[in-house]
A protein has these predicted regions:
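Compositionally biased P/S/T/G-rich terminal and signal peptide-adjacent segments
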Residues: 42-67
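Non-cytosolic coordination micro-motifs
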Residues: 1-40, 70-173
């Protein structure tokens, strides 16, 4: 079950209110998906992180309990694609060892938000009961790294089944 996984002690289904104040949540800049405002993404600012450099959560727009539908942890690899891919491979191997019968899909795609076509992600998606887990290596192109100060990073993303369906059917249509 995807809810058994944690990113910095936070799981799918938890309330973000257990970790930060309502005021902090409401004052955060929200990132919406291109085709729908049903869900939004915010950076979670906890006191400190043990494993990740950044943590991002996905919340439902009309939910005043701030239930977490998605959570991602990112480890910066400081514009080093080789390190990024190596770390992604290591995490993938660990997950396959933990779940030898789990189905997964490897893919690579170009990020559409980078008009230069230089930025890409190499991903492995594991399909779990009630959700999905993705391991990304985000390889940002040189132009985006300079203009947006983007960093290559390894990202572990947990999505509830509800969020997974939303992303696959409505978020980018």
């Amino acid at each position: 079950d995807i809810r058994d996984f944690e990113v910095e002690g936070i799981s799918i289904g938890d309330s973000l209110l257990d970790f930060v104040s309502k005021k902090k949540i409401e004052n955060k800049e929200k990132g919406f998906y291109p085709s729908s405002k049903n869900f939004y993404i915010i950076f979670a600012e906890l006191k400190s992180f043990e494993t990740y450099d950044k943590v991002v959560v996905t919340l439902k727009s009309d939910d005043k309990l701030y239930k977490i539908y998605g959570i991602s942890g990112a480890i910066d690899t400081y514009r080093n694609t080789k390190t990024c891919l190596s770390k992604q491979k290591e995490i993938k191997k660990d997950l396959i060892n933990l779940f030898p019968n789990i189905k997964y899909i490897d893919s690579t795609f170009i990020y559409p938000q980078d008009a230069t076509g230089e930025s890409k992600a190499t991903t492995t998606e594991f399909d779990f009961k009630k959700g999905a887990l993705k391991v990304f290596c985000n390889d940002w192109g040189n132009t985006r790294e300079i203009e947006k100060n983007s960093m290559d990073n390894v990202q572990v993303q947990l999505n509830s089944e509800t969020l997974k369906v939303f992303i696959n059917t409505k978020a980018y249509k």
